[in-house]
Every structure is written in C-alpha cells, then in structure tokens.
A protein has these predicted regions:
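Short, acidic/polar
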Residues: 15-27, 77-87, 110, 205-208
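Acidic/histidine-rich helix-loop elements
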Residues: 9-18, 43-47, 197
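Active-site gating/metal-coordination segments in enzymes
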Residues: 34, 49-139, 187
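Alpha-helical elements of Rossmann-like donor-binding domains used by nucleotide-donor carbohydrate transfer enzymes
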Residues: 22, 57, 82, 86, ...
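Divalent metal-coordination and catalytic microenvironments
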Residues: 6, 27, 35, 58, ...
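Catalytic pocket-lining loop regions of alpha/beta-barrel enzymes
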Residues: 93-94, 107-222
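Mid-to-C-terminal alpha-helical segments outside catalytic/metal-binding sites
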Residues: 1-7, 16-34, 85, 217-220, ...
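Active-site beta-loop-alpha junctions enriched in small/polar residues
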Residues: 7-10, 40-42, 73-77, 98-102, ...
Length: 266
C-alpha cells in the first residue's frame, strides 16, 4: 500500500488545480492508495470572502472519501486551544503548520500553545522545514529541537528536512530527539526533494536521503506529494528514485506508506 502525506487541497473557487477530484486523479495515475489532505491556510479563505472555515470545508469535502485523511490548520488570530480542539472534533489526524507562511516563530509562545494541546490530544503535526522567503531568525530548523525538548510525546514531521540549505541542521534535530519514551517521534518528510527539475531550495541528493536512513533508522521517514504543486510525472520520478536507493526493502516500504500508516493508526 502506498500512503502519501502532504497534499494541499482547495475549493475550486480558490485553486482549481488543487481540488479533491484532481488529487484523486493524480493518485490513480501514480498508483497511490491513500493520502493526507491539508486544509488551506485561513488567509486563502479570507481573500476569497468565504464564510466557512478551511477546516469546516475540508471535513465536508472528505467526509465520503475513505482513502483521504484530513490535517487541519490553525488560525493564529483565534483562541489557539479551541482551534486545536476543533481540529480533533472534526476527526482529523493532525495539523499542518508552516512557520514562514503563517508568520509565527517555531519556539514562540503562541506556537507552544498549539503544540501543548496537540500533544495532549495525540495529534500529529506536519511542519514546513526550510527557507520560504521570510526572516530566518524565528523559523530556522534548529528551533524544532525546542519543540522536541519541551513536548517529548508530540510526534511531528520536518517536511523537506531543511532542503538544500538546512539539511544537516534538520538531521541534527531528528538525531537529537531519537531517545525517550516515544520513538520515533521526529520524522523526515521526503517531500519536493527531487532533482528532476534541477537544484532548487528543497532538493536533496541520493546520498543525503540514504544518510537519513543510516542516521535515523528505517521507520523515521515518510513520502509526501506537495500536491498540486507537482504533477504525476514528478511524483512517479520520486517514487522510482526512492526505490532505487541503497537502503533496505523495509525502509522503502516504510517511506512509501507504512510509517505514515502506523503513525496515524489507520
């Protein structure tokens, strides 16, 4: 079974290429069985004048989609504990957080409120990890070590694992949080790391991908789509690339779905 993380989905009036139907077509084309869908960030709904919330929309959109699992979004202008509670009430498995885009500090007081409640409720968090055209001071990957330190039962993924610029820093966070009662709890998100379109901000080499496995083990990595920002050819290339790496068959199975399945309990 192939189970992919990291699909950004949208109502058609906000981003036509990012609809649930288009995601399902891509999954069929690529042979992907299940996927995690992220609710859009709240500013996208506000810009379009929608009266529903992103989490309300996503809950309705995937209600009858047994192969799609929801991750909610947090609106930092609202009561954060209530925001996380509503995400759990919708039956979502986790939260998508993007420090540069949402403009919050990884180790900030507001963010810690989200982590605390997510830990209490057993929600997984998928973080953007790496540069994204925002001041780096509050969003450097090393700050995720603070999340691991203060919330030892919280499970989360570092998507792109820092990318081209912050790979070693992100890997250090994973390795530094590899002990404790909950293991593994910091995961590498193998998302948008391809070299098929040249070297960009999130590209990782085969050697770096193999290093993730050798340093953190077979059960700490998971594959992500970054839909709709990549199409079927890109996704197929990545899946073939991962299967060609000099790592165990067990590691490959885990990357392409088994780790995510276990983490989310589905």
């Amino acid at each position: 079974m192939i189970f992919a993380n990291h699909a950004h989905v949208f109502p058609e009036d906000i981003k036509p290429s990012g609809t649930i139907d288009n995601l399902k077509r891509l999954m069929d084309d690529c042979g992907i069985d299940k996927a995690v869908c992220f609710a859009p960030f709240s500013d996208r709904f506000e810009e379009c004048g929608r009266t529903d919330t992103p989490n309300e929309w996503l809950a309705k959109a995937i209600k009858n989609e047994p192969d799609l699992y929801g991750f909610g979004t947090v609106d930092f202008t609202k009561n954060l504990r209530d925001e996380v509670d509503r995400i759990a009430d919708f039956g979502f498995k986790g939260i998508k957080m993007h420090p540069p885009y949402q403009e919050f500090d990884i180790d900030g007081e507001d963010a810690f409120k989200v982590y605390e409640r997510a830990e209490e409720l057993g929600l997984f968090i998928t973080f953007h990890c790496g540069m994204h055209w925002h001041r780096l001071k509050g969003v450097r990957p090393i700050l995720y070590d603070e999340v691991g330190w203060f919330f030892p039962k919280l499970r989360f993924s570092l998507e792109h694992l820092g990318g081209y610029h912050f790979f070693n820093e992100s890997l250090a966070v994973m390795c530094n949080n590899s002990r404790g009662e909950v293991r593994p709890r910091v995961f590498a998100g193998w998302t948008s790391v391809s070299d098929c379109e040249g070297i960009d901000a999130w590209t990782l080499t085969n050697e770096q991908l193999e290093t993730i496995i050798s340093q953190t083990g077979d059960e700490s990595s998971m594959f992500g789509l970054d839909f709709p920002f990549h199409g079927a050819e890109y996704i197929k290339y990545e899946m073939e690339r991962f299967n060609s790496l000099n790592i165990s068959d067990t590691a490959k199975e885990n990357i392409l779905g088994e780790t995510l399945r276990k983490v989310l309990g589905v």
